[in-house]
Amino acid sequence: IIVLLMVVTSNADRICTGITSSNSPHVVKTATQGEVNVTGVIPLTTTPTKSHFANLKGTKTRGKLCPKCLNCTDLDVALGRPKCMGTIPSAKASILHEVKPVTSGCFPIMHDRTKIRQLPNLLRGYENIRLSTHNVINAETAPGGPYIVGTSGSCPNVTNGNGFFATMAWAVPKNNNKTAMNPLTVEVPFICTEGEDQITVWGFHSDDETQMVKLYGDSKPQKFTSSANGVTTHYVSQIGGFPKQAEDGGLPQSGRIVVDYMVQKSGKTGTITYQRGILLPQKVWCASGRSKVIKRSLPLIGEADCLHEKYGGLNKSKPYYTGEHAKAIGNCPIWVKTPLKQANGTKYRPAAKLLKERGFFGAIAG
């Protein structure tokens, strides 16, 4: 009996637990042993398919800045075009759907001279956005005045009368004040609530020499400077050379406006130095909180755990995903280059190999 026990427990005849001799199609890569065949795996990755964008579950998702402002671009809303005034809903996530915002349908704007195309995207990055109820400057009595506030048939208001952007006042000198003037400076106070950023829109108008003399009493190029939050910007107006142009069915115009904005932090005053043709700030944007921004097309359909720039709305069925790597927000799977698997079975070895290692008595015992 003693001899038999020694044979059964010898190295040549050991019984290996946790190893099966059944066929296995599963291979996993390990850190220490490389590729290993196992009897079972749990897939940890998925490869998404492209779908519509969706609202992010558990939070509000903002598509257009003003969903109820029909036939308006986001730039129309950001500048306060008369027929594009409305509430911008709060949102924790926003869709950048106008990669290069289109022209505002009002007075012709020289978009490429400033960063004004970025204004809708700047606003989109805030959770809460509202337009002030009061004007930040009294345009009629501003330095260099008295002024009348100009309007244009190219910018009709809700009653189809002449209008202009709500964020700016076109300061046209009164008849007895149409003369050239040296640069003057006006302070732009902070009128938003503490903790908000104030986005102040301003600009200037220029035209051909004849119109410049008629409107302002000076046909020379005019100088303009804005300064806020440590950022100073300089401009010189261009006189003439503009083909007549209409925006969104408006009246053809020989003049152009240049529009810019400045960001004023809580309690900080800004300044604008100007000559003739100034578009003085009026209503300002008050914004707070952060909204995560992702680039994609509209509309938003349904809800999803995750918003992905390439795949749209995703529901998280696995912790990881393969495919195209792009920006994503929400409860999203983690991108990996290759599929990941978690072994939930035992290590596989062919039956012939097990018989050789165990020997005759071990094979019977196994």
UniProtKB/Swiss-Prot annotation:
> Describe its PTM?
In natural infection, inactive HA is matured into HA1 and HA2 outside the cell by one or more trypsin-like, arginine-specific endoprotease secreted by the bronchial epithelial cells. One identified protease that may be involved in this process is secreted in lungs by club cells.
Write down the Pfam families for this protein, in alphabetical order: Hemagglutinin
Q: Signal sequence span per UniProt? A: 1-12
Q: According to the record, which residues are glycosylated? A: 37, 71, 157, 177, 315, 344
* Record-level Gene Ontology MF annotations: host cell surface receptor binding
Q: Which residues form a coiled coil?
A: none
Q: Other notes on this protein?
A: Major glycoprotein, comprises over 80% of the envelope proteins present in virus particle.
Of which family is this protein a member? Answer: Belongs to the influenza viruses hemagglutinin family.
Q: What is this protein called?
A: Hemagglutinin
Which organism does this record belong to?
Influenza B virus (strain B/ID/1986)
Instruction: Provide the gene name from the record.
Output: HA
